Amino acid sequence: MTMSLKRILTSALASAVLVTSALTFSGCADTSVAGTIEGVTIPAGIYILNEYDALSQAISDFKDKNPDVDTNAEGFDFFAQTIDGKSFSDYVKELTAQNCKNYIAIEKMFDSMGLAIDEAEKSEILADVNATWSNENTYAQDFYGVDTYGEYYEKNGVGKNSYKEFMLNGKKSELIFNSIYGEGGSKEVAQAEIEKWFTENYTVMRYISVSKKDKDGKLIEDEAKLSELKDLAEGYAEKINGGTKFSEVYNEYLKHIEEDEVEIKEENELDILLSVESTSPSEEFVKHVYGMEFEKAEVYDADTYYYVVVRYDILKGDYLDEYKQVALSELKGDEMTATVEAETANYSVSFNQATVDQFSPESIG
């Protein structure tokens, strides 16, 4: 899935990317033109936002294709690498061009399908944009020397209107996607398929971690003391299996270790959504949890903790409704991308080379 279409999951993705990245190029007015696609003008701001998506995608693609390369090593430079026989920079440029074409395709598809963003959603997006431009931000002040992120974007080629249109385009992507694959859509994904994806990829757990370390943070080596800790953990598991609420046992442990944490009152406050691909705290731990019976507490003996763990059926909570969009995107995101990119196959494209050069991948990376 290209980065521009990953905004199906959250139209604020590009905002998050830009907030955590440092733009280094000199600014240009929001009215600067990056080019035209199907006769539609692409402002520099829209081009830059799509380029940031492309840069993120290129980094992800490189890591996927080169899992043994330490990209965090001192002196590592993505722009000295190649992807699929292309320079990293050229790869980003190609993705950027496609992202811009996808942007236009989304606009055209949205109109042709007769869709509309409801006023509440539009107001929420506009409020977020206005807040970005008007709310003072200490991070922006400390790191970028400006009062607001809006001022920061303006200095670096992304005007308020471009930012707004980019966010609205993300919402349009989401609405198109849901009109095809969501409830009542032309290619509605069956509930059984969604549930199957959830149960294969996620589970819910709660745990209490009984530390094997002393107050100084050193691992306890005394077997008698370790045995006491294990007995404590097993006692908690027995209480849970005997019908005591998990939250009550958890609070009991907090008192035992004289922890001043806020007392847990709701059971689901302790829920953890665990991905099958997770490696925290270890791959062995995750594999063990996925093999557990539902609602039966067990003690897992790890290097530094005795974990009192309970696994729960993810389909019994509210998670299915809460994360349904994630499941749909994982199941049908690539198909959606193919559909959109097919729309762009014969698009006429003309980029302003001066603008493209000014906002090169190297300049924003």
Regions found by a protein language model. Name each.
Residues 29-155:
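N-terminal targeting/tethering segments
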